[in-house]
Amino acid sequence: MSNLVIVESPSKAKTIGKYLGPDYTVKASMGHLRDLPKSTMGVDLEADFEPKYVAVAGKEDIISDLKKAAKNADTVYLATDPDREGEAISWHLMHLLGLDESKTRRVTFNEITQKVVQQSIASPRAIHQSLVDAQQARRVLDRIVGYQLSPLLWKKVRRGLSAGRVQSVATRLVVDRENEIRAFEPKEYWSLDVELARQGKAGGFVARYWGDTKKRELENQAQVQQVLDAIADKPFTVTSVKRADKKRSAAPPFTTSTLQQEASRKLNMTPKRTMAVAQQLYEGVDVAGEGTLGLITYMRTDSLRLSNEAMADAASFIRSRYGDSYYYGKPHVFKTKSSAQDAHEAIRPTHVELDPERIQSSLTREQYRLYKLIWSRFLASQMANAVYDTVAIDTQCAGHTFRSTHQSLKFSGFVAVYEEGRDDEAEAVGSPLPDLQEGEQALCTNTKPEQHFTQPPARYTEATLVKAMEEKGVGRPSTYASIVSTIQDREYVNKTDKRLAPTALGEVVTQLMMERFQDIIDVEFTANMESRLDDVEAGKQNWKALLGEFYGQFHQEMVDAEAALEGVRLKVPDEVTEEICEVCGKNMVVKIGRFGKFLACPGFPECTNTKPIVEKMPGSCPKCGSTILKRKSKRGYAYYACERGTECGFMSWDVPTANDCPKCGQTLFKKSGRGRMKPFCINEACEDFLPEDKRGYYKKAESKSAEEKPAKKTKKKGTSK
């Protein structure tokens, strides 16, 4: 019996093929094979929003190969990812390949392990049309908004702009935060620390002003001086000593959102890169001594659920490696929020016994670091609470209370494996305190008043923006990474020192949207639309009825906006830089030309000075050790050169990385382009040197000599073909 299994990627095909016998052929579709056309909207607005799907250009050979394989198979298993997108890919495959429903099966894998793959093949199902419809509804919604709104932005703001339904809301979040920062008015406050010495005993300690009869802030220097005058030359008395054990429980295992946040904080990985590496770990990696293994469960999920088997495996591993006292005592179950799609588990390792160090040699640096993060977080979630010994001591003088606090780790529990990162500053632990007793006297040896001002809300990082989107219901696990990436790619938002700020363009477009398309830019409206798409998936809402309701209002807003903006052209303010024009002394501004951004003098046309924008790269020049700069050729191609220019002479088309060669210590480079690029050494004196012909460049076809070229056919006058 012949069976065909179709998945999205070759790596996934390789892993699954290992678990199935010779009766199964596993092939990859390489993603979507059918989609809306790129050149037109592809949605018939007059025919109940019927999508006009076409085969994806450039995939004709794949389609032909799959059709041939499907024709010769007795059963076809569609094994694409277990979410809306995966369900839609399977549905498109069935229609595009002309598969017979009676011999077509749908299978999904929450994890790609031998047990799960074989169980899924043994218990297939039909395609869930409600999941497909939810994906179609989102796709058509986004296409309508993009294709109708983008031309308006071209005409009224700048050519080449594009608008997106959810990306517009994400940009607004960044713009709103920037406006909060601008409107923020700092308020003064003071802290007052006193250094105290015990009377007749060794050991001093520091206490901070807390209040009088109740906690209060010192708002200005005058209030501080009142306290200083009151306590001058007076003894302090210890009025309260409170000791307690404070327990801290582990964070739950990762969801998509929390994985992206933590990878951003701890690994400095963008959400987009995090998902790309997680996809590699899910689909399968060649592990020495084990073969190809899927190392983590499906990475697009908002569920905190763990299988009983996974929790039992974790319990066994914890007891074996750390001892019984480090286990939580029972399966630690975390409550999933009501809006979560609970079809999947949380993100966890598929084989907890494969600890990161054991398989490190089989993984890339990124894979290892992300796998270690996922493995540690999962294991910690099933471990005992950490216990801290805390002490709080109050001392009083002249009716004023000063407090000292300290905490120390008493039992590490889950902290032995993992501790969650933070976006804000960690709570001060305080210095160790002497063994003070109530009623004990102390003398003040020094005072330290300090002025402070309240700080504005911080700009979003990629991590905190993902967190805000999740909290507000904007987007879903499958879309967070692409949204954060898109608003930067389209230059509505810039990232500087890991913080996101709106560009002048982003603010102009957001203001236009807020004035003319209030629903599209509204956070609540967008969150409600996500909920209604969930209803489509659950079979509670007809997807075309949802589109009809949305389009009626959106179309009217489009008509009104066109009328209101007739003859209007919105100006985007130039971005002013710190770069000074050496000709006239003005601050240069950023302009956009044929080959991208460049610096120009705002004094044009009197001053025509321009400069390329220079971007510093990681690593150092392999010839002289100076900084490497990213530059652009006259044709707009990026290359990398030493900051010393012709004095040094180094340049390369390859991209410098932040990693050094383990053999010679020079900066490693990688081939430019998308996808997984393995770094290599370009130092010819190094034993790890990789010659240019092995770096994966495309070879230009050698030009044929005149003798080899076929003669051109000439057409005689007066003759016809």
Language model segments and positions:
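Core structural elements
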Residues: 138-149, 166, 196-198, 246-258, ...
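Intrinsically disordered, low-complexity regulatory segments
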Residues: 1-136, 148, 211, 330, ...
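C-terminal or mid-to-C-terminal helical accessory/interaction module adjacent to the motor/catalytic core
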Residues: 112-194, 244
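Alpha-helical scaffold elements adjacent to nucleotide-binding pockets in ATP/GTP-utilizing enzyme cores
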Residues: 15-19, 65, 88-96, 116-120, ...
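Metal- or metallocofactor-binding catalytic centers and their adjacent structured scaffolds
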Residues: 214-252, 440
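Structured, non-catalytic alpha/beta "coupling" segments that mediate domain-domain communication
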Residues: 14-37, 168-217, 381-431, 593
